[in-house]
Amino acid sequence: MYVFIRANNPRPTFLVDMTTEERAAMQRHVAYWTEKAAQGIAIVFGPVADPKGVWGMGVYRVDDLAHMQRMLDADPARHILTYDAFEMPRGVLGPGEPGVHPFP
């Protein structure tokens, strides 16, 4: 199954005014999800340039929602970010991506 995650920053100005501790946690956060991408779990993730304030997004290939929650709980930035998770009942992947699930 696929899950869309919206990662909410603690404030709209977060990307430009992170504390030293927040920046270090976010560097570990990127490394953590980059490892998940190398494992084929994270399909795409990164910041979204919303004019109201930047937030993060990701699409993940997981066994179930509990699997996704375990990964979110282990995220090094868990104490900074909040998450909204949405199951994607179906998805179409581009050529070369394993597991294409076309709409009926």
Task: Please place each PLM-identified region on the residue numbering.
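Conserved, structured core segments of small domains
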Residues: M1-P104
